[in-house]
């Protein structure tokens, strides 16, 4: 079962099962927001085809690659937990400007349980990453709101960065923020231009770019491309 092809196929199948579950979870959350008449326009900017592409194509492919890379080791569980959580949070935030805090809380609890069982020596630094990540973005949000007299971050963004901090550790939070900021400026700017929306006055969800930064930095850390951080976050 450790043959790369078998691992790849098995990972894709696991990703499909996970994708079907997360697709249903995201759809139910978005439908609930519409039914409760939450103060957004009631219709996602992108059709449900986005969810199908992300959960039924991208997630299985990423899961297959992770399985082929990790093999059947405990680290694969941690990888899939982070990947699945970030995928579903990114899609929900992109379509509704909201974050499902249930996903964040469950992911934090499962990661804590994983660390307790498989890497208890890293539990403390993971919790530090959680607290620093959440506190950092909350503090930056207060500063932005004070200076600009308007909210710049969503209420769930600090919790999302805290979640990411459990995987990348506090040293990885800076690179995550840099990737999120640059990708948000570039990709968000392109999206606004295509929609013919004003660049400075149209809100763009920041969560998807945090998810992109978190996943990218974590994979770079684990693959050894950030060796100066590996001693602190190699779990």
PLM regions and their residue ranges:
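A membrane-topology feature that recognizes alpha-helical transmembrane segments
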Residues: 1-235
């Amino acid at each position: 079962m450790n043959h790369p092809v078998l691992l790849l196929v098995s990972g894709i199948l696991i990703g499909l099962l996970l994708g079907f579950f997360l697709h249903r979870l995201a759809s139910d959350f978005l439908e609930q927001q519409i039914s409760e008449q939450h103060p957004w326009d009631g219709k996602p900017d992108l059709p449900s085809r986005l969810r199908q592409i992300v959960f039924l194509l991208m997630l299985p492919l990423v899961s297959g690659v992770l399985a082929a890379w990790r093999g059947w080791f405990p680290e694969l569980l941690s990888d899939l937990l982070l990947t699945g959580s970030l995928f579903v949070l990114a899609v929900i935030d992109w379509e509704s400007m909201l974050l499902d805090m249930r996903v964040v809380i469950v992911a934090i609890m499962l990661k804590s349980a994983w660390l307790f069982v498989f890497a208890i020596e890293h539990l403390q630094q993971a919790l530090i990453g959680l607290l620093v990540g959440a506190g950092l973005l909350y503090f930056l949000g207060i500063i932005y709101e004070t200076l600009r007299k308007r909210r710049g971050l969503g209420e769930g963004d600090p919790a999302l960065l805290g979640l990411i901090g459990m995987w990348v550790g506090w040293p990885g939070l800076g690179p995550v923020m840099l990737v999120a900021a640059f990708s948000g400026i570039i990709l968000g700017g392109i999206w606004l231009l295509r929609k013919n929306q004003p660049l400075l006055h149209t809100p763009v969800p920041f969560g998807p770019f945090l998810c992109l930064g978190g996943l990218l930095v974590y994979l770079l850390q684990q693959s050894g491309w950030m060796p100066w951080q590996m001693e602190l976050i190699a779990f």
